[in-house]
Amino acid sequence: MTNLLVELQTEELPPKALRKLSEAFAEGVRKSLADAHFLADSSVTTAYGAPRRLAVHITDVLAKSPDETFRQKLVPVKVGIGADGQATPALVKKMAALGINCAVTDLERVDDGKNEQLYYEGVRQGVELASGLQHALEYAVKHLPIPKVMTYQLADGVTTVSFVRPVRHLTALLGTEIVPVELFGLKSGRLTRGHRFHTSEPIAIENADSYVEQMKAAFVMPCYDERRAVIEAELKRRAAALDAEAIMPEDLLEEVTALTEWPVIYESQFESEFLAVPQECLILTMQLNQKYFALEDRSGKLMNRFLLVSQLIAKDGGKAISEGNARVVRARLADAKFFYDQDRMHTLESRVEGLRHVVYHNKLGSQYERMLRVRRIAAAAAALLGANKTEADRAAMLAKADLRTLMVGEFPELQGIMGEYYAENDKEPKDVALAIREHYQPRYAGDALPSTSVSLAVALADKLETLIGLFGIGQLPTGEKDPFALRRHALGVLRMLIEKELDVSLPALIDAAWEAEKDVAGVVDNRRELLTFFADRLRVMLRERGATAQEADAVLAKRLDKLADIPKRIGAVRAFMDLPEAEALTAANKRIGNILKKVEGEVSEKIDPALLQEAAEKNLFEELRAVEPAAEALYAEGRFEDMLVTIAALRSPVDAFFETVMVNAEDPALRANRLALLKRLYGVMNAVAEISRLAK
C-alpha cells in the first residue's frame, strides 16, 4: 500500500467557505475510496486548504481494490426455472442485467420460509485505483458545500463547467506515480503552482509525501490549521514586543487564514487624534474593512498601532506595506470620526421621532410604534423587578434612537453601543445610558447579561415584545429556520430570569407583553404557544448544562412560574437519586400518581384519623404529619436538597402501606380517606419535582 495525494489548484476560493470546502473535499474522497475498499483500517486522511487549492493526503491506499465475494438474490425458483428444468426468460433477463453468466445448475436454492429462491454466488473482480479515484473525485465535488457556483469556459473555448472557482491544475499521485483521472476538462498530472507572487514556474510534485515540503519551498503553507497557528502565534509575539495585546476575534482569524498562503505579519499605525472616537468604532472599522488586528495596552486601552497579515515577503522589511496601510486606515478612521462628530450634534431624544420612518415589521409597524410597546412592557417589568420605573421608561424610549445615527447606519453592529456613548454625551442618567447598551444582551450564547435592574427590565421588555409580536402573527421558528432569532431571544429571557435569580413570574411577564401588543391589528393571542416554546428552550438549556432528560422532565413537570430556583431543584433531584431510598420512593410515587389519575372526580386532602384502620396506614399518617412541617420549612427556605432528604424517611412506611393496605376498599368512606392520604403524600413528595419522572 502507498500514500495518495490529490490537489485541485484553483483561482482564489471564497475565504469564509474555505475551511468547510477543504474538510468536505477530503472527507468526500476518503468516504468514496473507503466504500470501494481502497483504504486500510490504518489509513489516515489529512485535509489541506489554502486560498488557491483544495488537497487531500491519504495513507495506506491500495493500487487495486481486492476481489470481493458476493451473493446475489435473483428470483423465486418457480419464476426462474421452467417445467423442463431450464431457465425461464425472466431469469435470463435478470442474470443478463446483473452481468451473471452461468448454468442454472450453478445457482443456489434457498428456502426463505415463504418461497424457494435462486441465489448466485460469485467473485467481483477488484478495480484499478484510477477508476475508484475518478468516482471519488466526482462524488466529492458533487457533495461540496459550495456557497455560490461559478460557470466558466474551458481552454477549448467551447465547453463550460461549473465549480466554486475555476480549476487550473489537477494533481493525483499514488506514491510517485500519476493516477490517471480527469476532472473539469483537466487530465491529472504532477504539476501545480506555488505562491502567486514569489514563484513563477510550475512545480512538479515528486511524490505524495513530498507535497507539503515542496509547497512550503514555493511559499505556500497548505495546512489550514498550521497557517492559523502561525498567524496567531506571530500576532501574539509582535503584540508582546509592543507591550500590547492583539484583539483577535475568531471570525477574523479564520478569514485572514483563508486569505493568505504564506502569512507575514506587519505593524502599522494611525494618528492618535482618532483615539477620541469610541474604540469600538475604531476596532470595528479596522476589522471589517481592512482585516486589521487592533492593539490594546495592558490597561485595555486602544493603541494607535495595529497589526496586519499579508502574504508578501517585503524586501524593505514591510515599510511600504506599513505606510500604504496607514494611508488606507486614515481615510476609514476619518469617516468614523466624521460620523461621530456629526451624530453628537443632535440628542438621542431628538431622534426618537425619526423612528416613525424605520420599519420594524410590515405587520407590526415602525420602530416608533414598537418603542411605545416596549415602554409599556418595561414599566411592568420594572415594577416586578423593583427597578427605577422612570429610568426604565427613559431607557426604553431611547433604546433604538441610535438607529437614526450615521455611525449605526454605517456599522449596524454598533447599535446600543453608540447609543450609550451618545446618551452619556447628552448627560442622561448613568443607568439609562448603560441600559441602552445592555438591553441587547445577551446577544449570543455565553454573552454577558445586563448588569443593573434598569437594564434587565428593558432587556426583558425588548425580547418579550419581539417574541409576543412575532408569535402573534404566526412567525414561529420551523426546523433550522429562525430568521428572527426567536430561540436566542427566548434563551436570553431564560438566562436573565435564572442566572440573575429574578423573583419574577415568566407568565406574568408574558401577560404584560400581551397587554402591550394586543391592540396591534392582526396579532392573535399566542401566549400558550409561547409558554410551550419557552418550556422547550428551557429543557434544551438544562440538557446542555448537564441535566439528564429525566431530571429536566421531573423539574419542568412542575410548570413553575418562577424559574430562578430551577438549578437548585435540578441539583436536589440529582442528590436525591443518589439516596438508597430513591428507587423505591420514585416507584411508589409513580404508583400513587397512577392511582389518583384513575379516580373520577376531585380527591380531597382532608384525612379523618378515625377512619384509619390498618396499622400501616396509621403509621404512614403519623410519619407524614411528623415530616410535613420540616419539609415545608425547608421548601420555603429554598433548601430543596435537604427537603428531599427529609421525605426519604417515608420510604419504610410507604412500602409497608402498599404491602398491607387495600387502597380501593369496598367501603366508600375508607377508600376516600386512603385516597386523601395518598394525595397529601403525593403533594409533599412532588413539591420540588415530579419524582415519578425519575422512576426506572
Regions found by a protein language model. Give the residues of each.
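Amphipathic alpha-helical "coupling" segments that flank catalytic cores
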Residues: 1-696
